[in-house]
Amino acid sequence: MRLSVRRVLLAAGCALVLVLAVQLGQQVLECRAVLAGLRSPRGAMRPEQEELVMVGTNHVEYRYGKAMPLIFVGGVPRSGTTLMRAMLDAHPEVRCGEETRIIPRVLAMRQAWSKSGREKLRLDEAGVTDEVLDAAMQAFILEVIAKHGEPARVLCNKDPFTLKSSVYLSRLFPNSKFLLMVRDGRASVHSMITRKVTIAGFDLSSYRDCLTKWNKAIEVMYAQCMEVGKDKCLPVYYEQLVLHPRRSLKLILDFLGIAWSDAVLHHEDLIGKPGGVSLSKIERSTDQVIKPVNLEALSKWTGHIPGDVVRDMAQIAPMLAQLGYDPYANPPNYGNPDPIVVNNTQRVLKGDYKTPANLKGYFQVNQNSTSSHLGSS
């Protein structure tokens, strides 16, 4: 009996020693890691700090990191970016939300720092290397996108000019995808001029100037899209999205790897609803996207562009032809609409659509207000 008790005590003692040895070993490894970080000229971020964790109203936990498949929607303003993001927002698994406005500004600053040799030298000398800046940009952009709206399985950002930085963003977020909204530049320019959408660098009193600036902006974005590659960047033609919404959205969701939902065809029914489409009262497209997809804005520009500009169109905006638009057609033949779009258009012309309760009375009061976008050099 005494021998048996001794064996039990001996076994318990050995187990205790083993546990203490394991704990001591773990502490030694942790101390080494800390000391290595202290000796290193740059501290290392712990892996768990690289993820954002958010809990939705449904008590589901969402984890976001640099490897997540973010969606970036952009293009020249007045090219259908708001319609595109509203359609995506209608999907139960996607959240885009309003324009952040700050992301394209920060991207422009980052680009300016890298372009200036003197500034880059100063930053490098101060230890603010490209690696440091990129890590900060990555964290900042992810934080803004994730926290400016409700969490969702798939996050999307819509700031028109972000797609001037598609190559850089694809480096920060390697699994991200991009939707470049493309629209007939004549329609985009007519819309920004008549709706007084101020964009830095665009002279809204001149069709010629605005078309020249449109050409420069879409040229940069299209080149970035091509460089990123067809597997990651999809040009989406506004006209085709409006004429054939079901066909276009099936292609878009397939490209994004997102399952089909009929809700994307009826974004107007989900405006202002929980988990639906949130609209900003200060974005100039809001009064249009509360309506079902319709033909109202497709060819409004015809007959309004000055004759000398129409005559020189191919030289002023060569990107029109490159994107497949006929610079001399007034109006071009964009194609025949689906029956549902014809029906929607008839409803809109009769005023047969609902204004969300939170926006009622707003459009009458603010119809003459302006909205601005940050352009870039």
UniProtKB/Swiss-Prot annotation:
Marked site: Transition state stabilizer: K158, S285
PTM text: N-glycosylated.
Catalytic activity: L-tyrosyl-[protein] + 3'-phosphoadenylyl sulfate = O-sulfo-L-tyrosine-[protein] + adenosine 3',5'-bisphosphate + H(+)
Cytoplasmic side of membrane: 1-8
Enzyme Commission number, as recorded: 2.8.2.20
Membrane listed as a keyword: yes
Keywords: Disulfide bond, Glycoprotein, Golgi apparatus, Membrane, Signal-anchor, Transferase, Transmembrane, Transmembrane helix
Region (Interaction with peptide substrate): 101-105
Glycosylation sites (chain numbering): N343, N368
Side of membrane Lumenal, spans: 26-377
Any single GO CC term annotated in Swiss-Prot or TrEMBL for this entry: Golgi membrane
Membrane topology (UniProt): Single-pass type II membrane protein
Disulfide partners: C96-C156, C225-C233
Active site per database record: E99
Top class in the EC scheme: transferase
Family membership noted in the UniProt record: Belongs to the protein sulfotransferase family.
SUBUNIT field: Homodimer. Can also form heterodimers with TPST1.
Protein name listed in UniProt: Protein-tyrosine sulfotransferase 2
Lineage of source species: Eukaryota, Metazoa, Chordata, Craniata, Vertebrata
